[in-house]
Amino acid sequence: MKTEKIRESILGGKTSLGIELGSTRIKGILVDENNEVIAAGGYSWENKLENGIWTYHLNDVWTGMRECYRTLAEDVRGKYDIELTSVGAMGISGMMHGYLVFDKEGRQLADFRTWRNTVTERSAAELSELFGFNIPQRWSIAHLDRAILNGEDHIKNIDFMTTLAGYVHWMLTGEKAIGIGEASGMFPINSETHDFDETMIKKFDSRVADKNLPWKLRDILPTVHSAGDFAGKLTEEGAKLLDPTGKLKPGIPFCPPEGDAGTGMVATNSVGQRTGNVSAGTSIFAMIVLEKPLSKVYPEIDMVTTPDGSPVAMVHCNNCTTDLDSWIGLLKETVELMSGSVDVPKLYDTFYNKALEGAPDCGGLLSYNYYSGEHTTGFEAGRPLFTKLPDSKMNLANFARAILFSTMATLKFGMNILTEKEFVRVDRLLGHGGLFKTPGVGQKLMAAVLETPVVVMSTAGEGGAWGIALLASYMKNRADGESLDSFLDSKVFGDMLGDSVAPDAEDAEGFKKYMNRYRAGLAIERAAVDNLN
């Protein structure tokens, strides 16, 4: 019965398709009118390091897009015994930031420089000072400025600068459009006008005036759109590009292309003010939707927006679970010496759960998980450390808790700026990533660390491709005047509240004691970085 209803949805054009180009996987998700996943496709790819630059070739983009669409159409055929020839709405998402420039004929002028490149230090610093706004190295404007400062030959021929998602959208629809969340990773956004900041554009034009370029910055930037806007439709050329078999028909309406941060917010239902999400895996970051812009610039905090234009503060830290994983590896080796084999997922669960038995302040134990530097605490490089006082209580529970607290400590520094200096209030945070895999543990400790309820949902794993499919669905299915936040609450997540854990007062007090020692011990970390090579 359900299969027949889904067939009707597909044939009746009630579906929405989202494709996200992630760093290692291009993923497609098809949803029905209830925003439930009904088919999926994908393609694995990798970036390349060429001439010192992390890049992807654009022909690989189209190989991946076609294969992603082909496998999704095959999934539809296998499950529902019909050919996919159209969908009700569509959207493209991708890795944010980076540098993609084209001339008047649409020819690529320079290798695609991805978000991963940290080669724009001078430009990022000088632009941050010029604008009075934090410009991270990965932003498009920092890459453009570097190319100009370096006198790269192609700059005089630039007609259009965009992102990966913006490029794919342009090729499929012919429209030089971009979603506001994605745009906020190219150049600063004015939260009143929901467009690129005109004052900062003029400052940039003045900065490069002596180069006598034949264009002004505004001329080469895409048009900014908010969630819910119509941003073009699939052209005949676009349909053939995506589906060379010719079965896919043109005319499908497109929502604005968005960045992976924005689609992640949508997929975790954290686009409303006073909400946010924490992603905790190899690195850790929090994105908080603000009620108003911050009062000043903080180098530790990046400012972006939600897909509907609300200001978002992002605290990003380089280190999270790598050090924890190395300790688990040591414990695994120990267990193997005694019993010969070990169930690794069970070992992780046991370690995590043991942490809940530890003293609230970890009994005086202290850990630094710095495999690499942390700008939040002022370290350009890192040395993983574990230390304790002679009278500290060294047992497994305290040790496990200290290691888990260390995965969250640097995030707390950035979050303190928001809560203590800017008085930002957060009603709930949605947790996702490996740190939250063991039920209830990472969530309980994170709630204590950030002194905010933390929710974990089963859908958090669906990811950005589902998020961009939901944005396409929002454009197609929203009621007049219905906000994105309201649409997600009522038509997507509904009663799906997830498992919410409130901060425990004793845990929170224990973490404060841990943090006092952590701050004092940063001098040990500094000595290690300066002297251990």
Residue ranges and their predicted role:
Residues 54, 58, 62-65, 92, ...:
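Generic structural signal for well-ordered secondary structure
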Residues 42, 114, 500:
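Conserved beta-strand positions that form and line the central face of beta-propeller blades
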